[in-house]
Amino acid sequence: MGHRIPVTLGNIAPLASKPFRPGKLALICEGGGQRGIFTAGVLDEFMRAEFNPFDLFLGTSAGAQNLSAYVCNQPGYARRVITRFTTTRDFFNPLRFARGGHLIDLDWLIESTAARLPLSMSSADPLFEQGKEFFMCACRSDDYAANYFSPTSDTWLNLLKASSAIPGFYRSGVDIDGVSYQDGGISDAVPVREAVNRGADTLVVIRTVPSQMYYTPQWFKHMERWLAESSLQPLLNLVQHHEESYREIQSFIEKPPGKLRIFEIYPPKALLSSALGSRLPSLTADYQTGRLCGRYFLATIGKLLVAKPPLRRHLPRINTPGPLVISPVAAANESLVKPISPGLQANDAAFDNEDLA
């Protein structure tokens, strides 16, 4: 059996990790709507530390959006999209939904961010030229089969839309090569098994819910209120399919097969944010939690994955002393009688910057 190492605030398991050979390294990001603000915080810390040793990237829904910002090296991008765009009535509008429109307007979101906050897609080219791969998960509308798409500059935004098209909330699926697709979370909310199928030996998984948490999606509870009874049965079938898939994924993460190693980064408790309709203070708090978890990962596990420790250490500024002034008072210039006792660490050969983490 493989190894699962939980990484969250208050859990000391990462501190016991010893050096190892990661092999092919994959980064997998779970969806979760606005709860993806936690993932944004983790990845912003990774980018701040210039930490990107990964060979493979896999994301679903909000996870695909966060990874897009990461591979394009745009720190703060995902946070701004979530806090500035997904909190507006142009995007999330229950009244519009009650009148027959979309509850979430992905068309508006994609068009608005492309115009006002575009992805720097060309910045990802150097990664892809090195052989690194990025896949977004979306599910077919007819049989819910999960498919994985590698974006190009021409297909990137449409793939993001497809991966995030929550059934019922975005009433129409997204067309890809003549086939209708919906949210990848239906069948593969955390594409860890696909990463293994693509040869990954070590997985870093960023979750948007506490580990080992099983839940009925909040959005389905809303749908029960808003949809007619005749429309509920197909949706109920979809939710049952999603829950079965989610349990299988959770079991895979808890008990990795073979020699697989999984580092699971997750919030220490349920986030304040919801998938939709979150308030800005909640999003801000969850973003900060993500940054703290990202820092903890870098200080414990991250340094095992790269040759150079990823954390930057900011040394205090050295002030150049001014000219020496000799006091005319005789006592002020007397030699010190007692010897100076240096700090213990001054003669400790084992003491270095690593002790400052």
Residue ranges of model-derived segments:
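Gly/Ala-rich beta-loop-alpha elbow adjacent to hydrolase catalytic centers
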Residues: G59, G63
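Patatin-like phospholipase
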Residues: M1-L58, S68-A357
